[in-house]
Amino acid sequence: MAYYSTVLKRKVRKMLAVHFIAIGGIGMSGLARILQSKGYRVSGSDLKETELTKKLRAEGITVFIGHREENLASDVSLVVVSTAVSQDNPELLKAKRLGIPVMHRGELLARLMQEKKGIAVAGTHGKTTTSSMIAYVLEKEGFDPVIAVGGEIVDLGYNAKAGQGEYMVAEADESDGSFLKLLPYAAVITNIEADHLDYYQSFEEIKKAFKKFADNIRPEGFGVFCWDNLQVREMLKGYKKRKFTYGFSPGSDFMLRDYREEQNQLVANIYYKNTLEGELRLKVPGKHNILNAAAATAVLRNIGLSFKAISERLLEFNGAKRRFQILGERNGALIVDDYAHHPTEVEATLRAAKLYKDRDVLVVFQPHRYTRTHFFYKEFARVLVDAEKVVLTGIYSAGEKPIPGVSGEMIAEEMKKLGKNPLYLESLDEVYNYLEQNLKPGLLVLLLGAGNINQVGYKLLGKA
């Protein structure tokens, strides 16, 4: 690790060629784009062709499909990997054999952040939207930030950019502990809940990791923390660094009041230390997004933006891809895609769908990862019983090996115990055929999951 750090401290500009193994992920592709914009010759490989790999290729990045030794050119100066890359990957083995430095994507993100005033957004839920809000406002207000977030910002058309300004906005990924490599100027924690228990083993370990992340804020910087979340509140006991809290709860520094829904907009007044800042209005649905907007406001006010500028830009904001993204309409049915893959996220997205009072909601949920399904199948069932109609699919493995006895049917069986009778369709082809026969005016089809369930929506709309 020390050697990799030394290599990057010499300014990556001196290294002409960088190769990304598993370049097709949203985080890895973003870093690849940033390095390419900085003047590096970038290549990468992934297991399968996707819209993202096609885009990277169109942007001039060499992308190989499949992992093979010959994908790694002999003049490559640095290889970047994600946690998903196995130790027996042929490109990784070749890099080690040739003595080419290998760096985890989290380390690369940390090194890029050292060059800027980093704004890192962490949390079990809400980090993509919150970081996208901050990035969007800074970009539109002329700050030209470096951007590395976990979803394409709809209004900007990208999730990563090598800006020339003083700030860098990044999503801080806790799933593999790599967010602890970051030393941000400003950090946000939106919430702390149990997730990624395959990596952390216990909720206590997750809480310790978030505490360390908060402790890693630079001495001259500040933290922004959600006061509504009890685990965050517990973490802040004895916390010494400069901090600001936000939320609906009394005692929040940036406090939301008078939440309401008006003409397809979410509205709340926001106060700082009991003094009215003004009114926040959003087009993106879901009460949780007002909380995300409050976090963004707290960060942006503390780096000098006026509330007027912030509120006007947040009203323009149309969200990030796969975050309650309206894909289109067919046969009068509205098709919406959302990345929700944790019970709390599913619950929040179902609440957001209730804003469409004139539509019946049909939820199609694709569980993500065997481990997550194993740990949370009862919680998924509990939140899904509130939906009008539910279709469950097979598990999207995300590269995990199957766990005997763990399947999407576990959620279906648990829902039946709670009085709901969902439809279980193992394959996405079955889901597509079912939806094609059942689309009708007044229906809202909500495709939920962090896997490839959105491809069903695109196929229904003739976009696949």
UniProtKB/Swiss-Prot annotation:
PANTHER family recorded: UDP-N-ACETYLMURAMATE--L-ALANINE LIGASE, UDP-N-ACETYLMURAMATE--L-ALANINE LIGASE-RELATED
InterPro entries: Mur-like_cat_sf (IPR036565), Mur_ligase_C (IPR004101), Mur_ligase_C_dom_sf (IPR036615), Mur_ligase_cen (IPR013221), Mur_ligase_N (IPR000713), MurCDEF_pg_biosynth (IPR050061), UDP-N-AcMur_Ala_ligase_MurC (IPR005758)
Molecular-function GO term, any one: ATP binding
Localization per Swiss-Prot or TrEMBL: Cytoplasm
Binding, ATP: 123-129
Name of this chain's protein: UDP-N-acetylmuramate--L-alanine ligase
Key words, A-Z: ATP-binding, Cell cycle, Cell division, Cell shape, Cell wall biogenesis/degradation, Cytoplasm, Ligase, Nucleotide-binding, Peptidoglycan synthesis
The UniProt record lists the keyword ATP-binding: yes
GO biological process: cell division; cell wall organization; peptidoglycan biosynthetic process; regulation of cell shape
Protein's pathway: Cell wall biogenesis; peptidoglycan biosynthesis
Pfam family, one: Mur_ligase
Protein family membership: Belongs to the MurCDEF family.
Enzyme Commission no: 6.3.2.8
Organism: Carboxydothermus hydrogenoformans (strain ATCC BAA-161 / DSM 6008 / Z-2901)
Catalytic activity field: UDP-N-acetyl-alpha-D-muramate + L-alanine + ATP = UDP-N-acetyl-alpha-D-muramoyl-L-alanine + ADP + phosphate + H(+)
GO cellular component terms, semicolon-separated: cytoplasm
Summary of the function given for this chain in its UniProt record: Cell wall formation.
Location (main, coarse): cytoplasm
Presence of keyword Transcription: no
